[in-house]
A protein has these predicted regions:
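N-terminal subdomain of nucleotide-sugar transferases
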Residues: 1-60
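Hydrophobic residues within alpha-helices
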Residues: 25-28, 103, 159
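An amphipathic, basic-hydrophobic alpha-helix
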Residues: 65-105, 109, 136, 140
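Nucleotide-sugar donor phosphate/pyrophosphate-binding loop at the beta->alpha transition
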Residues: 113-115, 122-144, 154
Length: 168
């Protein structure tokens, strides 16, 4: 029997927000629990945010909440000792942006493999909401994060092709 894995899950979105990223993270955590693994979740602070899910601790980090938008978590130095103290085998980055970018850098410093999931077209959202000028910069930012990770998963052919178009 294999020893349980220790997984840090860093997510840009978590309960009480309900969306594709949150739902995917919940399924990952439920699977980790069912398989006897250990996990720690790092997520943005949010009004009504829970501090435990499936028996796993959810560590909330300061965030900016704006009406109608997801809370944006702020990377902070306290994340590194939290990750280091948990001694993970892998860091799972769920739709990485600000927190995920910081966690990927921590993983590099601590020599911890990372798994990122590309499931939010942040640049596309920017274009949709009239921030066309930010599109290319956001595309490069997200690509840079995924290029840094050990492995990237893409949940659809479209997202896979989108990543490939940026050199990932």
């Amino acid at each position: 029997m294999k020893p349980p894995l220790r997984v840090v899950v860093v997510t840009e979105s978590f309960l009480p927000q309900v969306n594709g990223v949150t739902n995917s993270v919940l399924r990952v955590l439920e699977h980790l629990r069912a398989e006897g693994h250990q996990a720690l979740v790092i997520a943005p602070e949010s009004s009504g945010g829970i501090t435990e899910y499936a028996g796993f601790r959810v560590k909330r980090v300061p965030s900016l909440e704006m009406k109608g938008l997801l809370p944006v978590g702020f990377p902070q130095k306290a994340i590194e000792p939290l990750i280091d103290g948990f001694n993970p085998d892998v860091i799972h980055l769920a739709s990485p942006f600000f927190l995920g970018n910081y966690a990927s850098r921590v993983a590099e410093r601590l020599d911890i493999p990372t798994l990122s999931v590309y499931q939010t077209d942040i640049a596309g959202f920017a274009r949709h909401y009239g921030l066309t000028v930010a599109h290319d910069s956001l595309k490069r930012w997200v690509a840079k994060i995924h290029k840094r990770t050990t492995r990237t998963l893409a949940p659809s052919n479209w997202s896979c092709e989108d990543l490939k178009s940026t050199g990932v």
